[in-house]
Amino acid sequence: MGRKKLEIKRIENKSSRQVTFSKRRNGLIEKARQLSVLCDASVALLVVSASGKLYSFSSGDNLVKILDRYGKQHADDLKALDHQSKALNYGSHYELLELVDSKLVGSNVKNVSIDALVQLEEHLETALSVTRAKKTELMLKLVENLKEKEKMLKEENQVLASQMENNHHVGAEAEMEMSPAGQISDNLPVTLPLLN
């Protein structure tokens, strides 16, 4: 008779849970060791118990070396994934243009079915809408930047206008002080004679 299938869910009894953890951890370590020996693979295994105790296993290579290799590979994979997503974005448009070129240039035009043309048109419309959305986004950012610049220039203009007004008042007061009997003359400002 075979074993009955155990439902995979959290074991409520603490002692049963600990026994199961120990047995399964040992089984997992044994499987990792077998994989290392049979396939000549570098294997690193980390297990953390519910109480926070760390159990580890590593084959021939040092655990730290294996984890360093994993870290480097993972970083490279992330970079490649980022480049791939950018390339897919640009590549899909490039592929679409190549598809249009192959379907509609030369003698191939006569052999293209209506369904293929409809599908090609849908792809072109999708690419066009994506391009328009990106263009709109960039234009909105540009408008926002220009509005911000306009606001700064208006504020600067107000500051300069108030400074000019203050300078004008100071100049007018100085002129009034120099004219005889407080009268404002339309003539040029009075200058002092040169001293000999």
Swiss-Prot record:
GO terms for molecular function: DNA-binding transcription factor activity; protein dimerization activity; RNA polymerase II transcription regulatory region sequence-specific DNA binding; transcription cis-regulatory region binding. Its main location: nucleus. Gene3D superfamilies: Transcription factor, MADS-box. Transmembrane segments: none annotated. InterPro entries: MADS-box/MEF2_TF (IPR050142), MEF2-like_N (IPR033896), TF_Kbox (IPR002487), TF_MADSbox (IPR002100), TF_MADSbox_sf (IPR036879). Residues 80-170 form the K-box domain. A motif (Nuclear localization signal) lies at residues 8-15. Keywords: Developmental protein, Differentiation, DNA-binding, Flowering, Nucleus, Repressor, Transcription, Transcription regulation. Pfam families: K-box (PF01486), SRF-TF (PF00319). High expression in the vegetative apex and in root tissue and lower expression in leaves and stems. Not detected in young tissues of the inflorescence. Before fertilization, expressed in ovules, but not in pollen or stamens, of non-vernalized plants. After vernalization, not detected in ovules. One of its GO terms (cellular component) is protein-containing complex. GO terms for biological process: cell differentiation; flower development; negative regulation of flower development; positive regulation of transcription by RNA polymerase II; regulation of circadian rhythm; regulation of photoperiodism, flowering; response to temperature stimulus; vernalization response. It is found in: Nucleus. Prevention of early flowering by expression of FLC requires methylation of 'Lys-36' of histone H3. Repression of FLC is dependent on histone H3 'Lys-4' methylation which is partly controlled by the lysine-specific demthylase 1 (LSD1) homologs, LDL1, LDL2 and FLD. May also be regulated by the level of histone acetylation. Putative transcription factor that seems to play a central role in the regulation of flowering time in the late-flowering phenotype by interacting with 'FRIGIDA', the autonomous and the vernalization flowering pathways. Inhibits flowering by repressing 'SUPPRESSOR OF OVEREXPRESSION OF CONSTANS 1'. At elevated temperatures (e.g. 29 degrees Celsius), maintained at high levels in a JMJ30/JMJ32-dependent manner to prevent extreme precocious flowering. This is MADS-box protein FLOWERING LOCUS C. It comes from Arabidopsis thaliana (Mouse-ear cress). The gene is FLC.
